[in-house]
Amino acid sequence: MSDDRRRGDEDGGAGTGVITKTKPKTKKPSLYKVLLLNDDYTPMEFVVHVLERFFNKGRDEATVIMLHVHQHGVGICGLYTYEVAETKVTQVMDFAQQHQHPLQCTMERE
């Protein structure tokens, strides 16, 4: 081999450089409050049932939330990611409509 080739291969063909490891920055997803709105027609027992069925609340906690909705006009059912909150709102609205109750359920960003 010629001397020129040997000199060019002194570093084994690998260039010098700095390897940096970057840590991906993951952002926590935004949370959304699922809210029940009070009305004068939906029975309180139906609201308790909705909270138990769709939000996994125990009887006592569901009753407390229902009374809060009744007294204050609105109450928080839970905090969820956008997709989960949207699904729960749809489920509650469909269920209320099937049972001919005007119960309203909405979501808003935390």
Curated annotation (Swiss-Prot):
Gene3D superfamilies: 3.30.1390.10
InterPro entries given in the database record: ClpS, ClpS_core, Ribosomal_bL12_C/ClpS-like
Region (Disordered): 1-27
SUPFAM superfamilies: ClpS-like
Biased composition (Basic and acidic residues): 1-10
GO BP: any one term: proteolysis
Role, per record: Involved in the modulation of the specificity of the ClpAP-mediated ATP-dependent protein degradation.
The protein's assembly and partners: Binds to the N-terminal domain of the chaperone ClpA.
Family in the record: Belongs to the ClpS family.
Name of the featured protein: ATP-dependent Clp protease adapter protein ClpS
Organism: Parvibaculum lavamentivorans (strain DS-1 / DSM 13023 / NCIMB 13966)
Organism lineage: Bacteria, Pseudomonadati, Pseudomonadota, Alphaproteobacteria, Hyphomicrobiales
